[in-house]
Amino acid sequence: MTATQPTGAQLEVPPWDLVLKRNSIERLKQEKFPLDIIHELPELIARGYEAIPEEDIVRLYWWGIAHDKPKIGTFMVRIKVPGGLLSPAQLRAIGAISLRYGRNYGELTTRQGLQLHWVRMEKLPEVLEAIAQAGLTTVGAEGDTVRNITSCPVNGISRDELFDVRPVIEQVARFFWGNRDYSNLPRKHKFTIAACPYQCNAPEIHDIALVGTVKDGRPGFAVRVGGGLSATPRLSRDLGVFVPVDEAVDILRAITDVWQNNNRYRVSRAKARIKFLVDDYGPEGVRRMVEEQLGRSLEDGSGEVVPGK
């Protein structure tokens, strides 16, 4: 008789000492909170590129700063753009920053953000300040954080959209970005929010997708969880709920807390994404845990596409 292997949900939740023993990035985060590295940036610059410990280079990821590849002593700076929407003034500002600090070159990313390259280390404070002056941020553009929030590129102007989600995206970005309670996640965490009936933002491949829908005349969202690509691709699963527009932050917090508070997803970086939580518990189990986290039941709903107007 062959013994059945227990599912992830049946295994004992590992203690923190085991997490720290097996996962060097979790140790690094415990030793020094990554967002705090910004206060040490002048000291790191004074020490020089070659003298910076690799652990501090990793912590700089939390500020959207990473080695250029190959490692040539300059840095890539990633900028968050909520929903991929830039004003003309912001675009001109980024162009000026690129001209002055990044060899007049910039990249548009697949997650609707921006990247600069070849930024010299001693110029990083000036670049970060210029980005902030443009009303943008690099905080959490990399690292174990909520990354840039993607959406339909024609939010607010498409005649087919069910409703304008730009205010929701701005609210979610304000809550999560730079929030210390959500800057020590098991792994990177990707949201997409849209009310595009064509789902051009690919909700199937995101960690959490808020999919615009209308129920009984009320605008809101269906919720999909656990999508992702890489070496272990998954299509996100529909939780079978309807969330009113004004509860968007609440549902995103609750789902994220269920995941980040379970040490099972901190032992191995390769098994840390929220898709493995969905593998272990299924969408019904995830919904139950989210309802427990919220302290209330969620309204039934569906992620079925609603035809455009």
Task: Specify the residue positions occupied by each region the protein language model found.
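Peripheral terminal and linker regions in Fe-S/redox and tRNA-modifying enzymes
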Residues: 1-309
